[in-house]
C-alpha cells in the first residue's frame, strides 16, 4: 500500500509548539543514545533483516552511501513510523529500539536522507529549515528499482565519509549468525574499487533447531576468513514475574565455535555485542535489556532470569551435545 505522504505532512504541520519542543527533545535524546556510527549501521542491517532481506548492499560512491535490500517493501505504516516519534521515551525507560526509533540514528552521520520503496520516494534534509526536519517527508520521484531491489536508502555523508567507511570494512561476519534472514552483506567502495563480501551458509544437524553455520569474509573475491559454528536456537517460556511485555516466549541463539568450547562468553543484544571479546568462547544473543549506549547489561530481574536460563542450557544440554 502506498503511503499518504500529503496527509503525513499536514499532520506534522498542525503540531503545536509545545509538542514540537517535546519531539525535538526526544530526537536529541535518541541522537545521544545512538551516538556511535557503528550502531547506525547495525540498525540498517537489523531493519533489513526484519523485513526478510536475504541480501544487503552498502555502496559508497564519493560522498554518498546507498543501502539496498531485497526484503519486503515499505508499507504505509512503515512510512508513518519513520515520520513520527514516541515522546514518552526517556532516559530511564526501556527504550523501544524497534523500527522507527533506531532508524533515526542515521541522522548522526547524515543530514540529507532519502528512502525509496515501492512507488514512494521521500527525503529528509536539514537545509529545509523545518524544526522537525528529521521526520517531515518531502516527496521525491521514486527510483526505477531493479527486480532485486525492494528498498533503497541514500545518505549524503558530509564529513563522516571516512568514519562510515572504517565501520563498514570492520563489520564482523559473526553478526550474520544472529540474523534470521540475511545471508550476504556486501560493502562496495566505488571510488577505491574495493568490495567486501560477508556470507553465511547453514545446514541442519541432528536435533531440534540446531544448525552448522559457516560464515566467511572475502575481499575482492579472495576469501580472507572462514569460521564454523554450531548454532542452537532455543525458545524460553517467560515467567509472569519477569514478563515485560505481552510475549510469553523469548528466543535466544547460542553459537559455539567448532574449533572448541571454553568458558569465556560474549553476550549480544541481537547483533550488538554488549560484553565479551570478539571470537572468544561461545556467543549468545537475546533480548537482553542493556544500558542506553549498549555498553553493559542492566541489573534487573529480566536479565538475571534470561542469563540463568541460557547458561543453564549451555551447561547441561549444550555441553552434552558437543561431547557427542
Task: Describe the function of each predicted region.
Residues 1, 110, 115-324:
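GHKL/Bergerat-fold ATPase module
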